[in-house]
Amino acid sequence: EELGALGVRTATLSIEPDFGIAIDVTHATDYPTCSPQKSGEIKVGAGIVIAKGPNIEPNLGRRMLDLAKQNDIKYQIEPIARPTGTDANFMQVTGRGVKTALLSIPCRYMHTPNEIVSLVDVNEGVKLLTYLCDVELDNK
């Protein structure tokens, strides 16, 4: 999405998928000058982040949460009350529209020369995506 979402728009129009899962980073808020009361509480090393909000198809979001719980996958929830600014937003509104979900890796100091992520979070995301690919999703 950093370059105008050209790739996701082209892919969505060409493939016309039933579902789309955007994978991105999100701001970790576990550093000294950040207020969790103002910015929410997202921690590096505490698991993959599952977004909830208007860009997220509710059934797909619930399925991801259920799979994380059933398989002991570490996760965090990030409420997003507006369009996400990620590929999930562009998939949702391109062409006929696509049911979307968003998984994010917590990133401390995003958009600086010293970004920090945890392989724990990356691996939890890989596990969740693997389980998601193994289940039948209802396309109603």
Where are the language model's segments positioned?
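Acidic/histidine-rich catalytic neighborhood of metal-dependent amide-processing enzymes
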Residues: 1-47, 137-140
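Active-site-adjacent substrate-binding region
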Residues: 42-122, 126, 132-137
